[in-house]
Each structure stands twice: as structure tokens, then as C-alpha cells.
């Protein structure tokens, strides 16, 4: 699926839009090993932030150039939407890192943008990478409103969900027993600290640091997912209004509409467990991880089917 010939790579370098996509891929690919090295004890967080910021600027230039070439907002095919999603993921990562400067954030978030750019650059056929005229139904201001908001919601939900996944791994490094939480912010918790061969004061100090980091990740993932959920809600509402204007129906149970609703319900369940049940830590994190699978099915899986109004085409046969 990811096999790219030398001739195809040369052709990509000849197209400035595709070349910018490859440049963003190279920057993100370079950032990943550095971010994981930081997690293991390195101290080059500024380097990763710089690489991700450069990748975001390159993707911005790519989208603006495609917009200028095509004459419409660049989210009309799978290549453009993947690049837009990568742009939104890098932007979300940079915003999250302003709240919590931790190597875990970059190690969890950077691979998502890399996968989006890699899939767009190396897996899609040329027919889905080229700009094409919009069909009449898509020549609407609702295109920018609906699709861009949905893509941004996916980015926020994915970043938040991968931060929740990081909570699962950081929890494993300590014996943390959660009792309750104040609306997902970790307001009250009890921790059972593990004993070790070191003296008690050192053990308490290390466990307190780990607990604080886990709480921060848990709270930050909750807030990021909340933003993504609100954007997803807005995207679904705008999509329904647009559908009614274009086709005379608010909801048609199109495959992507159905899976978008499932996605909304999964993250609604996540927020319910945080807000109403007082869950925090591992249990809501598992719900968020399930949301990642639903987003992948909703965004990529529907295109594998090649059916419905939202499908960009069955790209394995394109």
C-alpha cells in the first residue's frame, strides 16, 4: 500500500503541493525519535517544538497553495483532508504544549500528524492527490464551515485520546488508587505509594512527581476532548443544515453520518463518566482509546467502502 516508485517520488517533487507534503513528512519524521528520546530522559523539548511548528507552517503553505491552485478551500478530496487534519493535529499539539510542557505530549501527538501526511503522500493514488473541480452541491460556504470544523474536532479528539492513552502507560509506573475527582480535573485523589529499596523520603518524592504528571495528563486530555466534542457537535449541526439546503433532508443515515453519530456518542459517554460519574484515570482513558478506533472507521473506513455522499472514492481501486 505504501510502495512508492522513484518515478512517482520524482513527480511528487515536481509538484510544489506534493513537495511541501513531503517536507512536512520529513520534519515530523525527524521529530518523533527526538520526542521519544526526551521521554527516556533527554532534554531537547525545544527542538521537537520547533520541528512541529515548522511542519505546521509548511502544511499551512501547502494548503494555501492548493487553495490558490484549485480556487476552493482545500478539503475536497482525501489527500487535502488528510493534510488539513495533519495541520490541525500539529496546531492542537502546539496549543496543548503551551499548557503542559512534557515530552509525553509530543511523543503521543506527533505520530498522528506523521501518519496523516504519510498516508496522503505514499498510500493514495495520484488521482486522489490531484486537485479537481467541486461538484455543484459542494460549491457552498457550508463546505468550509462544516468540513473544517469536523477536521478540527477530529484533531482535538485524537490528541486528547492519545494523551489519555499516555495516562494508561504512566499509571502503570505507579500504584495509583483513584477515589474521586472534581469534574475531571483531579481535585481529590488518594494514592497508595509503592515501597522500594530506596529510603522512604526519596520514594515519596518520586511518587509525588509521577502522580502530579499523571494528573496533569489526565486533566489535559479531558479538556482537549471537551473542546473536540464541542467542535464535533457544531460540525454535525452545520452538516445537517447544509444537507437540508442541498438535498432537502436533515439526516439520511449515510455511512459517514452514522459513524459520526457513533463517534459523538462514544465521546459523550466519555464526558458523562467524567462529569456525572466522577471517573478519572484509567477507566475514562479506555473509553477515549475506543474513540480513536471509531474516528479511524468514520474517517478512513467509509472511504474503503466507496459508498455514500461523503466518500472520496474507493482509493484502493482508484
From Swiss-Prot:
Cell compartment(s), UniProt: Cellular thylakoid membrane
Protein name: Cytochrome c biogenesis protein CcsA
Annotated membrane topology: Multi-pass membrane protein
Main location: membrane
UniProt keyword Transmembrane helix present: yes
Family: Belongs to the CcmF/CycK/Ccl1/NrfE/CcsA family.
Subunit description: May interact with ccs1.
Amino acid at each position: 500500500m505504501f510502495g512508492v516508485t522513484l518515478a512517482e517520488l520524482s513527480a511528487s517533487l515536481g509538484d510544489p503541493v506534493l513537495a511541501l507534503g513531503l517536507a512536512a513528512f520529513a520534519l515530523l519524521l525527524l521529530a518523533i525519535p527526538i520526542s521519544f528520546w526526551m521521554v527516556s530522559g533527554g532534554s531537547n523539548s525545544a527542538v521537537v517544538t520547533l520541528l512541529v511548528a515548522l511542519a505546521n507552517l509548511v502544511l499551512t503553505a501547502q494548503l494555501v497553495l492548493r487553495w490558490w491552485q484549485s480556487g476552493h478551500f482545500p478539503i475536497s478530496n482525501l489527500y487535502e483532508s488528510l493534510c488539513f487534519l495533519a495541520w490541525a493535529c500539529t496546531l492542537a499539539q502546539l496549543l496543548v504544549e503551551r499548557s503542559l510542557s512534557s515530552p509525553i505530549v509530543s511523543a503521543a501527538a506527533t505520530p498522528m500528524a506523521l501518519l496523516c501526511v504519510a498516508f496522503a503522500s505514499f498510500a493514495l493514488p495520484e488521482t486522489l492527490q490531484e486537485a479537481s473541480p467541486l461538484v455543484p452541491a459542494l460549491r457552498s460556504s457550508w463546505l468550509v464551515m462544516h468540513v473544517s470544523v469536523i477536521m478540527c474536532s477530529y484533531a482535538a479528539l485524537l490528541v486528547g485520546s492519545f494523551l489519555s492513552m499516555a495516562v494508561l502507560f504512566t499509571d502503570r509506573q505507579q500504584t495509583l488508587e483513584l477515589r474521586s475527582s472534581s469534574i475531571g480535573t483531579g481535585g481529590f485523589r488518594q494514592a497508595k505509594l509503592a515501597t522500594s529499596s530506596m529510603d522512604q523520603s526519596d520514594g515519596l518524592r518520586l511518587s509525588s512527581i509521577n502522580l502530579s504528571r499523571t494528573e496533569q495528563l489526565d486533566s489535559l486530555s479531558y479538556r482537549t476532548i471537551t473542546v473536540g466534542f464541542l467542535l464535533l457537535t457544531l460540525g454535525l449541526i452545520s452538516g445537517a443544515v447544509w444537507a437540508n439546503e442541498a438535498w432537502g433532508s436533515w439526516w439520511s443515515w449515510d455511512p459517514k453520518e452514522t459513524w459520526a453519530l457513533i463517534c459523538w456518542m462514544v465521546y459523550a459517554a466519555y464526558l458523562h463518566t467524567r462529569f456525572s460519574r466522577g471517573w478519572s484515570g484509567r477507566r475514562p482513558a479506555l473509553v477515549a482509546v475506543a474513540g480513536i478506533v471509531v474516528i479511524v472507521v468514520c474517517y478512513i473506513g467509509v472511504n474503503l467502502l466507496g459508498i455514500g455522499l461523503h466518500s472520496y472514492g474507493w482509493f484502493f481501486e482508484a
